[in-house]
């Protein structure tokens, strides 16, 4: 991304910033709640047995009330880092070890305005067909980079995504291929 930004700047497109969408989010993966039960020493904590694709089941304690067996959720295991800078360590809660944390959308750095109301509180529950053990950045589309480009009046050819794609292909020495933008009519006449 930095190389592309530098090359675009050299040809007259001022790249103001390069933004990594999942910056600071490291080691968080998708996991499945295989078992859940109340903590014996607390009325607000839950013991979750988690399969996050590592080949072993780990115990994670949570105070969230919206987690159920078979839910697929973001799991920050020991060694993970959240966008806040927090690094996950093994913790002891009311006498039991917790080897990670189940994450809310806010803890993943997702703006609440982008979420449905039911996704704003508690643990971020993912669709049931979400594969386990996958980097959460990939699942949520946060494994991408955004170039913020300030266009000048002399670069009217780049005021749309096609123009920017042509310019990017030119500076990278690759072929530009126009995307297929055909529309297929359905029986009712709506596309």
What are the residue ranges of the model-derived segments?
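Phosphate-backbone binding interfaces of nucleic-acid-interacting proteins
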Residues: 1-189
């Amino acid at each position: 991304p930095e190389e592309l930004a530098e090359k675009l700047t050299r040809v007259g497109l001022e790249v103001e910033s390069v933004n990594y969408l999942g910056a600071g989010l490291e080691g968080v993966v998708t996991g499945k709640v295989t078992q859940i039960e109340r903590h014996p020493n607390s009325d607000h904590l839950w013991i979750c047995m988690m399969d996050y694709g590592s080949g072993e089941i780990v115990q994670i304690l949570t105070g969230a009330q919206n987690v159920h067996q078979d839910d697929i959720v973001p799991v920050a295991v020991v060694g993970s880092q959240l966008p806040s800078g927090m690094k996950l360590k093994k913790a002891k809660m009311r006498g039991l070890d917790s080897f990670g944390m189940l994450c809310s959308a806010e803890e993943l750095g997702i703006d609440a305005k982008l979420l449905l109301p039911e996704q704003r509180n508690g643990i971020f529950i993912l669709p049931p067909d979400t594969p386990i053990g996958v980097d959460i950045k990939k699942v949520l589309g946060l494994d991408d980079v955004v170039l913020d480009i300030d266009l000048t009046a002399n670069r009217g050819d780049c005021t749309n995504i096609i123009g920017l794609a042509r310019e990017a292909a030119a500076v990278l020495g690759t072929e530009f291929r126009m995307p297929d933008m055909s529309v297929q009519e359905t029986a009712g006449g709506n596309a």
